[in-house]
UniProtKB/Swiss-Prot annotation:
GO annotation, biological process: angiogenesis; cell differentiation; positive regulation of endothelial cell migration; smooth muscle cell migration
The protein, known as: Angio-associated migratory cell protein
Domain of life: Eukaryota
Organism: Pongo abelii
Pfam family, one: WD40
Length: 434
């Protein structure tokens, strides 16, 4: 793979605060970036000070499932397969995957078979099953220090295990689950449910706090990097930025400021000053996390001529499925259901590149420290793109059905995918100089 040097690229780009976003409109407020990340100990202490309510909970089913035989781990499939390891213990579509953030040596996967497994990336060896779910496991992830792993199913049953002892340490039944995420600095778990609530628990003691949204599902959410706020998107198109300690919304975006359809995804930049939201209305909105104001709106050129959607209407042929910020250049990537990958310049708010896939994009991830963006799609292929040129660098194949989720190791040496073919795969990424 060849790529152009990016030296000087970031330096030649004018800073965001000197530019206008909406044509002749002026920027109302300049957001000053924090001098550095907050101290983890301070954040953990602040989370200790949060007033949680005591919630009654029912005891979960403690009966374990019978593990499938270890020979379910295989090394290859018939046909082209670029993967190094295939994990095949799931008996139905595998919906989600997450890597342990501390060592990037373990994966947790959850699937339609009501099961979740923690396994080793190097050889696919099963460490333990996260047993007891009665519905499809759609969310799974490790805590910030990799000591805990959480799984959540569609019915709203959440469970947490201690990784080293493989023992279940906490469980809770909330409403139908929409999303789940660990706090970036503390053993605190957040989740959004179909009743519009966002839940926050201390784990494992179970102290609970709820953030009541509108009377509709909380469809996506993300904790901001400072660990003190969270942004949540809702089915009615509204966006709320919550103060996690106070339990109150700092900003609410609705009507023309919000989306004209359910939100599908949300992302933040590295310092948490900017938020990107995506929706079935085919728009991606750039929001200042400080002021709560929309400072940019992105639509792909392929649908730019479509009439505006009315309230509650959805695009029949397209929607935003995934989005994210580049960490080294003022670029954002947006992936659409029609297979379009759009690279937008945040400084000029213009479309820089448009890369077409043969089928819908499921998810995208930026490689840390570079301008390379990864996409997975319904055709079962992982692709790497140079966002500076819009050029396809390489692709990785091996699945026989759509890819439903993927994760990238911190050093970008491994891509781990899950698929409708009942498999999870580990691909080794060749990394020339970016």
């Amino acid at each position: 793979m060849e790529s152009e040097s990016e030296s000087g690229a970031a330096a030649d780009t004018p800073p965001l605060e000197t530019l206008s976003f909406h044509g002749d409109e002026e920027i109302i407020e300049v957001v000053e970036l924090d001098p550095g990340p907050p101290d983890p100990d301070d954040l953990a202490q602040e989370m200790e000070d949060v007033d949680f309510e005591e919630e009654e909970e029912e005891e979960g089913n403690e009966e374990g499932w019978v593990l499938e035989p270890q020979e379910g781990v295989v090394g290859s499939m018939e046909g082209p397969d670029d993967s190094e390891v295939t994990f095949a213990l799931h008996s139905a579509s595998v919906f989600c995957v997450s890597l342990d953030p501390k060592t990037n040596t373990l994966a947790v996967t959850g699937g339609e078979d009501d099961k979740a497994f923690v396994w080793r990336l190097s050889d696919g060896e099963l460490l333990f099953e996260c047993a007891g779910h009665k519905d499809s496991v759609t969310c799974a992830g490790f805590s910030h220090d990799s000591t805990l792993v959480a799984t959540g199913d569609m019915s709203g049953l959440l469970k947490v295990w201690q990784v080293d002892t493989k023992e279940e340490v906490w469980s809770f039944e909330a409403g139908d689950l929409e999303w789940m995420e660990w706090h970036p600095r503390a053993p605190v778990l957040l989740a959004g449910t179909a009743d519009g609530n966002t839940w926050m628990w201390k784990v494992p003691n179970g102290d609970c706090k709820t953030f009541q949204g509108p009377n509709c599902p909380a469809t996506c959410g993300r904790v901001l990097p400072d660990g003190k706020r969270a942004v949540v998107g809702y089915e009615d198109g509204t966006i709320r930025i919550w103060d996690l300690k106070q339990g109150s919304p700092i900003h609410v975006l609705k009507g023309t400021e919000g989306h004209q359809g359910p939100l599908t995804c949300v992302a933040t930049n590295q310092d948490g000053s900017l938020i990107l939201t995506g929706s079935v209305d085919c728009q991606a909105k750039l929001v200042s996390a400080t002021t709560g104001k929309v400072v940019g709106v992105f639509r792909p050129e392929t649908v730019a001529s479509q009439p505006s959607l009315g309230e509650g209407e959805e695009s029949e042929s397209n929607s935003v499925e995934s989005l994210g910020f580049c960490s080294v250049m003022p670029l954002a990537a947006v992936g659409y259901l029609d297979g379009t990958l759009a690279i937008y310049d945040l400084a000029t708010q213009t479309l820089r590149h448009q890369c077409q896939h043969q089928s819908g994009i499921v998810q995208l991830l930026w490689e840390a420290g570079t301008a390379v963006v990864y996409t997975c799609s319904l055709d079962g292929i992982v692709r790497l793109w140079d966002a500076r040129t819009g050029r396809l660098l390489t692709d990785y194949r091996g699945h026989t059905a759509e890819i439903l989720d993927f994760a990238l190791s911190k050093d970008a040496s491994l891509v781990v995918t899950t698929s409708g073919d009942h498999k999870a795969k580990v691909f080794c990424v060749q990394r020339p100089d970016r």
